[in-house]
């Protein structure tokens, strides 16, 4: 596998489909990073990413970032990554 430098297991929590889908991963991962900046809580990002973005934290972050109109797209991306 050709995994970019700087990537580790913590970057892909349960996301078996991340290889070959880096653009999707970057897209959903950015939601969690932005969410942590909004809430200023060091645990938000890891909770958002947990179980490959399939927890309620991920959905809460989408809503907190005022991206409700794209929630189905982000959930689809997360499900692709989890495969």
Swiss-Prot record:
Belongs to the arthropod CHH/MIH/GIH/VIH hormone family. GO terms for biological process: circadian rhythm; neuropeptide signaling pathway. GO terms for cellular component: extracellular region. Transmembrane segments: none annotated. Keywords: Disulfide bond, Hormone, Neuropeptide, Secreted. InterPro entries: Crust_neurhormone_CS (IPR018251), Crust_neurohorm (IPR031098), Crust_neurohorm_sf (IPR035957), Hyperglycemic (IPR001166). One of its GO terms (molecular function) is neuropeptide hormone activity. Disulfide bonds join 15-52, 32-48, 35-61. Inhibits secondary vitellogenesis in females. Has no hyperglycemic or molt-inhibiting activity. It comes from the Eukaryota. The lineage of its organism: Eukaryota, Metazoa, Ecdysozoa, Arthropoda, Crustacea. This is Vitellogenesis-inhibiting hormone. Its main location: secreted. It is found in: Secreted. It holds the Pfam family Crust_neurohorm. Found in the sinus glands of both male and female. Found also in the brain; the neuroendocrine structures of the protocerebrum.
């Amino acid at each position: 596998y050709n995994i970019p430098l700087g990537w580790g297991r913590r970057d892909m929590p349960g996301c078996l489909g991340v290889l070959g889908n880096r653009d999707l991963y970057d897209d959903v991962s950015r939601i969690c990073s932005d969410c942590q900046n909004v809430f200023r809580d060091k645990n938000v990002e890891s909770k958002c990413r947990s179980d490959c973005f399939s927890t309620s934290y991920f959905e809460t972050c989408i809503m907190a970032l005022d991206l409700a109109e794209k929630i189905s797209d982000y959930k689809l991306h997360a499900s692709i990554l989890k495969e």
